Amino acid sequence: MVSYGLRKPRKNLMRNLTYILTLIVLVGCSGEQSTGLDEDVLKEKKYNWRLVTSWPKNYPGLGMAPERIADLVEEMSNGQMTITVYGAEEQVPAFGVFDAVSSGSHQMGHSGGYFWKGKVPAAQFFTSVPFGLTADEINAWVYRGGGLELWREIYQPFNIYPIPAGNTGTQMFGWFNKEINSLADIKGLKMRIPGIGGEVLKEAGGIPVTLPGGELFTALQTGVIDATEWV
């Protein structure tokens, strides 16, 4: 699972940045395989899954999405399945969601694919892509253009089943401690911007930094970073 502000003419650098939130589920937890149990027994069986996220608990916007998912699942299953949502650092680090689900220690996770670029470089194309598609175009590609099948193919070796779970849509660029009036102003700029967007910043002379959302305000305030992008 971002928001942003550059002055013209560089204002359009991330204009078509969209951010897809991902619900990742441990393969083998779907219950599709035959258990040999009586149907009435299965109906009475209760399931309680743990969902870890990259956002602080009840974080505005992104952090509320997994809570809504948990509520809907409990309602639609008539209470047969409950999902306990954990914020970043409550059980795993903000960037530990992928490994937690892949290893089987947790059944579900809610995060953004560009955090795993070291493990799955192609996952970045399912998160924020500079000059990329709008929210509607992303949805069309994912659901009607074969995108979802590709996504699941690249996650399959990690025993993970990805499900789209939110899209922030087209965004601006970022928040800065100084005005950006020319390309020279980007030289040496330390900006929290993961994924492909970070590669663009690096080519322009900036220094991309990856930080969890819960640390951004303090990092910007204390000068650890000069700028940040976020929803």
Which residues make up each language-model segment?
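Contiguous mixed-secondary-structure segments that line small-molecule binding/active-site clefts
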Residues: 35-38, 70-74, 112-208, 213, ...
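An acidic- and aromatic-residue-enriched active-site/binding cleft used to recognize and process polar
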Residues: 54, 88, 196, 213-214
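Short, low-complexity disordered leader/linker segments with a strong preference
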Residues: 1-48
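A structural preference for short, hydrophobic beta-strand core positions in alpha/beta folds
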Residues: 83-87, 210
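Short, polar/charged alpha-helical segment
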Residues: 59-84, 199
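Alpha-to-beta junction loops
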Residues: 79-81, 97-111, 192, 206-208, ...
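Short, hydrophobic alpha-helical packing/hinge segments within bilobed ligand-binding/sensory domains
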Residues: 94-98, 216-219
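Extracytoplasmic "Venus flytrap"
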Residues: 50-67, 88-93
